[in-house]
Amino acid sequence: MSRLRIRYGAVASSLAVLLAGCVHGNPTTRVAVDRGYESVYLALLKDARRCYPATAGTAQREVNGTLDGPGRAGKITFSLRSPTAQETFMNVDIRGTESTRSQVDIQVAPGWEAHAQAVRGWLEGTSSACV
């Protein structure tokens, strides 16, 4: 049984290492939203936590968010955590461009594009589906 756990841990750790640095080098999907940045941030964070609930286990998905009131911005990171590493597979940056308008940039690691499409669906109100 412990060998099986070690193998799963090694696989999760290897996957996390492969994801390292992949997010930042990829093209950004930009979405304009007719809502204020804080409203967009809170709605996205709620959907993200619904679709990526905190779990226990060898390979976990994790969602973290930060809101910067003075900077009129927010950031949500989607990560894969293993016992030995944590690597981000998607970043969502939200910036208020006007009082009721926001710009959202989505960067995703290769192989995780369906997750970015899900986020876009949440933003545009065309889908509430989880991947």
Annotate each language-model stretch with its function:
Residues 1-12:
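Bacterial N-terminal signal peptides that target proteins for export
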Residues 18-21:
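C-terminal motif of bacterial Sec signal peptides marking the signal peptidase cleavage site
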Residues 24-131:
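Ser/Thr-rich, low-complexity intrinsically disordered terminal regions
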